[in-house]
């Protein structure tokens, strides 16, 4: 039986083993937030779309003196293979200024492993409708929507359909904006090409599931740097968040072209976004994402800003949390531009070392 067969026939909570994993995931999530001193509430918000439950974290702003132009909450949407807990200390810092919600997308983390359409265009629409139904259920008039990577792609797709529900659109190193680079494979060695084609035959995180209980140890060996940003529980969290029915991976794979690009990139439709929606791109100077092309395509638009955080990689919110929060809150503070500190990266002098 293939992973696709599993994804279409067996729900995440169908066995006691899976239920145990879901409980352990909730515990790991709780430990990460607790270690960071974050006071949060958690609930599974049920929406009409296939009775999907969306894991929702709420952190209320306790700073009564916070004065922002925007009265609307910050909503965080994670990237591929991630979940609410990976926003980490960024949530704590953002909540000093505004109420914060973070959700696990359907098919990821502790949300339902919803089966989406096998048609990429339909599947994307279903995901956007799930986000909209969540907004309605939460009774949020508008949102300051912050999306990272794949979450940035989906946030933009949402803004294209529901611009009146967006106060600010903030894209943290978003995936899926540029066209396919045909020279990518040419730059790989024969061994890298062979490995690349093997990976494409499976769901992206299949290897993590295949090693079973060794998953956390494998993650620790591959990403020892994560322990510098989170507690050691992050390795259990990432493994458990991706050990369930991989419906989120399946939709990501269906929307992607060789995983690295989108089949329907935002380069073809970003210009359709309502010009009254302020957009801020926040890229990591050392990210693998082609931010230079993104900035060239969209950076000169009147309602768009482009910022590069030097020294940060793809996970800009974790690599330089202080600068990331300054840029996000800058949008809420005076509507479009503005930082909490006057320093700014000189975009003409960026030195980028791709990973």
UniProtKB/Swiss-Prot annotation:
Residues 73-319 form the AB hydrolase-1 domain. GO terms for molecular function: carboxylic ester hydrolase activity; lysophosphatidic acid acyltransferase activity. GO terms for biological process: lipid homeostasis; phosphatidic acid biosynthetic process. It comes from the Eukaryota. It holds the Pfam family Abhydrolase_1. InterPro entries: AB_hydrolase_1 (IPR000073), AB_hydrolase_fold (IPR029058). Signal peptide: none annotated. GO terms for cellular component: lipid droplet; mitochondrion. Belongs to the peptidase S33 family. ABHD4/ABHD5 subfamily. This is Abhydrolase domain-containing protein abhd-5.1. The lineage of its organism: Eukaryota, Metazoa, Ecdysozoa, Nematoda, Chromadorea.
């Amino acid at each position: 039986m293939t992973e696709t067969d599993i994804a279409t026939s067996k729900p995440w909570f169908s066995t006691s083993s899976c239920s145990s994993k879901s409980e352990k995931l909730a515990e790991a999530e709780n430990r990460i937030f607790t270690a960071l001193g974050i006071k949060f509430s958690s609930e599974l918000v049920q929406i009409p779309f296939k009775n999907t439950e969306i894991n929702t974290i709420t952190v209320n702003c306790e700073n009564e003196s916070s004065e922002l132009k925007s009265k609307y909450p910050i909503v965080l949407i994670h990237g591929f293979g991630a979940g609410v807990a990976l926003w980490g200390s960024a949530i704590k810092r953002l909540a000093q200024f505004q109420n914060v919600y973070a959700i696990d997308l359907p098919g990821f983390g502790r949300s339902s492993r919803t089966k989406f359409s096998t048609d990429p265009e339909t599947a994307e629409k279903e995901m956007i409708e799930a986000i909209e139904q969540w907004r309605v259920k939460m009774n949020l008039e508008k949102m300051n929507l912050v999306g990272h990577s794949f979450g940035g792609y989906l946030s933009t797709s949402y803004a294209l359909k529901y611009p009146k529900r967006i106060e600010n659109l903030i894209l943290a190193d978003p995936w899926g904006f540029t066209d396919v680079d045909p020279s990518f494979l040419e730059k790989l060695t024969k061994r890298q090409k062979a490995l690349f084609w093997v990976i494409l035959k499976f769901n992206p995180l299949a290897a993590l599931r295949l090693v079973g209980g060794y998953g956390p140890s494998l993650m620790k060996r591959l990403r020892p740097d994560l322990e510098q940003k989170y507690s050691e529980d992050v390795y259990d969290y990432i493994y458990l968040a991706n050990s369930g029915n991989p419906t989120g991976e399946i939709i990501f794979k269906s929307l992607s072209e060789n995983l690295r690009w989108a089949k329907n990139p935002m380069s073809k439709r970003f210009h359709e976004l309502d010009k009254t929606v302020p957009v801020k791109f926040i890229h990591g100077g050392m990210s693998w994402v082609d931010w230079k092309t993104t900035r060239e395509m969209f950076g000169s638009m009147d309602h768009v800003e482009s910022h590069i955080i030097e020294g940060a990689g793809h996970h800009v919110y974790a690599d330089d949390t202080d600068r990331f929060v300054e840029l996000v809150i800058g949008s809420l503070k005076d509507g479009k531009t503005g930082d909490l500190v006057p320093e700014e990266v000189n975009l003409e002098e960026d030195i980028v070392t791709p990973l």
